């Protein structure tokens, strides 16, 4: 699988763009909770929480490896479903291509909102901030050539696919659940987005069933060998955390064992006049450093900046953009 992973992904996406109108032939579908913990109080009463929620579909004649989808910050499995402008999302596109698909709401998010921590959720009037940070444009203006439909209904749907985290952000809790999923379903390919990127890096260390990773605009907690954290990994993100983390060399080597492809979209500025945009420029550059370090050690990591291969106007959500 390793030598042809990148080519296969490209060919599949091109082929699946030619979506036919035949009825989807689904052999099996269902849902379940995975992972999590059980708390017990002094009276012996129980509380089940911190699990993930999984919805899956298996097409007739499914391919060997299923696809597991991890969403990003402030999102849930809707990321991979129908796009804000009403087109089929990756869920159906890859189902039509013959892949079993597993859409996950990570612990403390969406349908898996039964967290184990006390938390107060208040409305955050921040949608214009996310419009900028997700690189649709600079509110209220859209970027020229952006691959995002410019109508009120699309923007309304876009904002309504956001959901809060019911508890603190905890990559260990998230990755425990994803690892349990891979252990349950067997070998598969992990498709991650944004905050799901570091969740993917963590999950890879906890299961042998991840055969490849495709990550869209990963951000945060990039693992580097102890004592080799590059200066570019030491910057503090808008989330007030350092972008890179140090891990033992034996752990770092785990990332050389599966093919990894990473994608970044368009409108990445060359200066830091808009920190919420420049953060993604820095992440693209950092992932190129990360890829080189792993490839020098025998890894198979490819970083693709979409404008450099002729795809322009992509936002932070390339999987749901118009192109």
What are these regions (language model features)?
Residues 19-62:
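N-terminal cap/lid segment of alpha/beta-hydrolase-fold proteins
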Residues 13-15:
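C-terminal motif of bacterial Sec signal peptides marking the signal peptidase cleavage site
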Residues 64-73:
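Short beta-strand element of the alpha/beta-hydrolase
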Residues 87-114, 304:
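Conserved alpha/beta-hydrolase
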Residues 313, 317-323:
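Catalytic active-site module of serine/aspartate enzymes centered on a nucleophile-bearing elbow/loop
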Residues 168-189:
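Conserved acidic catalytic loop of the alpha/beta-hydrolase fold
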Residues 218-298, 302-304:
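The feature captures the conserved acid-bearing segment of alpha/beta-hydrolase catalytic domains
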Residues 191-200:
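Gly/Ala-rich beta-loop-alpha elbow adjacent to hydrolase catalytic centers
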């Amino acid at each position: 699988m390793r030598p042809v992973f990148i080519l296969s992904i490209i060919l599949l996406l091109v082929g699946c763009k030619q979506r036919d109108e035949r009825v989807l032939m689904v052999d099996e579908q269902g849902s379940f909770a995975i992972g999590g913990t059980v708390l017990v109080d002094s009276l012996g009463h129980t509380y089940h929480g911190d699990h993930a929620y999984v919805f899956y579909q298996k097409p007739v004649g499914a391919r060997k490896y299923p696809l597991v989808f991890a969403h990003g910050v402030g999102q849930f499995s809707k990321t991979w479903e129908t796009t804000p402008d009403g087109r089929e999302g990756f869920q159906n596109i890859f189902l039509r291509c013959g892949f079993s698909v597993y859409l996950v709401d990570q612990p403390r998010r969406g349908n898996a909102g039964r967290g184990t921590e006390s938390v107060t959720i208040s409305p955050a009037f921040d949608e214009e901030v996310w419009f900028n940070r997700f690189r649709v444009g600079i509110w209220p203006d859209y970027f020229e050539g952006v691959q995002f439909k410019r109508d009120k209904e699309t923007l309304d749907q876009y904002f309504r696919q956001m959901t809060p985290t019911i508890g603190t952000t905890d990559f260990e809790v998230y990755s425990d659940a994803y690892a349990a999923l891979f252990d349950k379903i067997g070998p598969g390919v992990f498709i991650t987005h944004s905050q799901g990127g570091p969740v993917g890096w963590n999950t890879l260390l906890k299961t042998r069933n991840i055969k490849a990773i495709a990550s869209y605009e990963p951000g945060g907690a990039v693992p580097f060998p102890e004592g080799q954290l590059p200066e570019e990994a030491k910057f503090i993100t808008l989330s007030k955390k350092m972008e890179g983390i140090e891990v033992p060399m034996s752990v770092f080597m785990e990332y050389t064992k599966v093919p990894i492809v990473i994608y970044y979209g368009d409108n990445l500025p060359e200066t830091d006049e808009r920190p919420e945009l420049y953060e993604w420029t820095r992440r693209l550059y950092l992932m190129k450093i990360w890829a080189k370090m792993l490839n020098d050690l025998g890894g198979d990591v490819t970083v693709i900046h979409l404008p450099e291969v002729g795809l322009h106007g992509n936002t932070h959500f390339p999987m749901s953009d118009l192109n």
